[in-house]
């Protein structure tokens, strides 16, 4: 490869099903290619994937930094020379968080830049992650009391600084109503009959299947959850983005109901006119609300105004 060509690697269990990744040129780039990106077979081995120039992976690949396992030194070598970006850092449970903090200790000892992203990270959790990266147990508690939003917190390895960021986006007030399962059909009909689309996010696959069956006689229903086999899930995700994504049309959205589980609440750029959700922790509820009136669309149904 030419000196300026960069090797990219997608490192997760369904990488072979990702069409964008599979369409990147493999081996030595052709002279007429100007993308500068290639896939090299040498890096396709899971133990060596982290050594590529750019790597996109699921978080469990990074958490293995904290484990005593064969070939872990290759992971340390690969990540220590990169900028590590971890998205949705609020979403990890107590078990994963222990491994995350240990991994941050390693990265901090290498002076590896780490960027943690979240829209709903509690202040106490923010401080515990910084303590792990710096390898310290205590510091000025005024940093934990800072409640600005959006808030940027950073450290150069010695001092900790925080800065409130300006937010130019439109603020919205969300109307919240409680309902029981028997009322869901009527709530949905009120929106879909006026040309709107509805998202229904529940906490189990069984409930998602139940609501999809319940609603299919009154609306177009798309069911999406994590138990679909990977090829089907990839097709459904593309269909979902086409129907209710940023570039979706009023025709594709009209009368549509998307029923799913927690896989709908993160990392999908989709937009519902009305959202129905099970009870859930507040940070997850805010994530789900992020799929409500996400894009500017002009007029929405009267029954789905915020």
Where are the regions a protein language model picked out?
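Conserved RecA-like ASCE P-loop NTPase motor core of nucleic-acid helicases/translocases
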Residues: 1, 115-117, 197-203
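Conserved interdomain linker/interface between the two RecA-like ATPase lobes of SF2 helicase motors
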Residues: 137-208
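Post-DEXD/H (motif II) to motif III coupling segment of the RecA-like Helicase ATP-binding lobe
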Residues: 74-83, 90-162
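Inter-Walker segment of RecA-like/P-loop motor cores
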Residues: 4-65
């Amino acid at each position: 490869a030419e000196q300026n060509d960069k090797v990219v690697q997608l490192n997760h269990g369904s990488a072979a099903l990702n069409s964008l990744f599979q369409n990147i040129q493999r081996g030595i780039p052709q002279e007429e290619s100007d993308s500068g990106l290639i896939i090299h077979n040498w890096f396709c081995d899971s133990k060596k994937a982290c050594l590529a120039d750019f790597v996109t992976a699921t978080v469990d690949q990074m958490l293995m930094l904290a484990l005593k396992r064969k070939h872990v030194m290759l992971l340390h070598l690969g990540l220590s020379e990169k900028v590590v970006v971890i998205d949705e850092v609020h979403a990890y449970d107590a078990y994963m968080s222990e491994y995350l903090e240990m991994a941050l200790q390693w990265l901090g000892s290498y002076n590896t830049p780490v960027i943690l992203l979240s829209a709903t990270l509690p202040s106490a959790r923010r401080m515990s992650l910084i303590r792990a990266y710096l390898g310290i147990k205590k510091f000025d508690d005024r940093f934990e009391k800072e409640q600005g939003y959006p808030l940027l917190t950073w450290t150069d390895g010695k001092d900790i600084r925080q800065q409130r960021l300006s937010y130019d986006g439109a603020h919205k007030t969300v109307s919240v109503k409680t309902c029981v399962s028997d009322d869901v059909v009527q709530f949905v009909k009120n929106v879909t009959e006026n040309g709107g689309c509805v998202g229904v996010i529940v906490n189990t696959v069984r409930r998602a299947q139940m609501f999809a069956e319940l609603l299919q006689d009154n609306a177009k229903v798309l069911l999406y959850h994590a138990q679909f086999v990977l090829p089907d899930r990839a097709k459904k995700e593309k269909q979902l983005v086409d129907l209710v994504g940023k570039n979706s049309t009023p025709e594709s959205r009209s009368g549509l109901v998307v029923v799913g589980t927690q896989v709908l609440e993160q990392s999908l750029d989709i937009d519902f006119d009305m959202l129905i959700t099970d009870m859930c922790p507040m940070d997850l509820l805010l994530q789900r609300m992020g799929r409500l009136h996400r894009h500017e669309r002009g007029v929405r149904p009267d029954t789905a105004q915020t």
